[in-house]
């Protein structure tokens, strides 16, 4: 019994150390990336026409990026909501895993009217290395009517097959270059603004 406890403790230490190393690497990568945008302009110089930002946000980070894009492009904005609230905690992870496996995504309260927009930004957090299931549900229903679509994701570090998955569901649209935003602290706000501007000006 003593040896079993010893090996269990050792396993916990090893896993914990690996987790800390991963967090350190992510933090270092974030710092390096944001340094590229330090002091750069956040001015949007490109005329995108009529713009809509569609997003889903569970924790608020995706909403923060969506709000920035909306403000910087003078866009309309639409937050997706599920018809029934998703569960929380461990049950959320199990529910999402099942939704992705069965491809039965949650029903939405309402869909945005996509009529007349030149560019539609679609934002999602990354769940299980792909887009959040409410966004996949939206894309299954959406007809972009020939508009240009630019995706953006928010994540801890790895977004897996996010881009391939959302592009595969996108109908009747010209897909523009995407952007990804790791979850970062407020100290990087100005750099994130500059990154958004750099991305949009390059579309």
Per-region residue spans from a language model:
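Active-site-proximal alpha-helix that buttresses catalytic centers in soluble enzyme cores
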Residues: 2-203
